[in-house]
């Protein structure tokens, strides 16, 4: 009986503290996979890693959250109060409660403010988002890195060299190379997961593999056969830095990395171990092993 009274008291005390806690607004960048697009009924056709660094002409998804009182959000209002010169981008109602979507149309920084209300009051938060073009990993399979590719600067830095050395032996680095030479079937539809920056469903010009390859005149002619990767590499060396699942697939499009750093901005490339980054590709039906690991 005594234990029950103490337990009840603690529950009521905790509830009282929770109800008295002022809200703390937080804008979260939401990861969205192809499966999530279908589940939520989104018509944007744009997957997202859930990072504030994202590719130009694609979407970033934002949600309103209370990380102070952890109470349900009653109302939320997002305001895009700063964007790059020449941008006509607007925040979009995507049909999900307390979410908004932003499709970048110009490279640069976008600043969004949230005003959020819970039963305990109102609070605000801001976030800076960076839309950029892809630059490619560089220094892959004997093709030297040229600025502004990632390894044109990071080669020779022990921490990065160690990461790169491990990465270049993985499937993420070598899948497209192997696909051209040895797969029983390969088509350009495979590129959206097995290269850097190829349009997933939403058409976007952001210097991804598909954009670079098209500009160079590369056209895949199947079927796969030994030597096709080497022929591609020899004829189109500037496309090789995009022909992997490289740095930017997980860190976000990197063209702003050097320009914003040089101006003293708070911008840095982003990294997260959250599943949303992997889900850009692995949430599809062929990712059964990955799904089972969650």
Regions found by a protein language model. Give the residues of each.
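Intrinsically disordered, low-complexity segments enriched in polar/charged small residues
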Residues: 7-8, 262
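Boundary of Sec targeting at the N-terminus
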Residues: 20-21
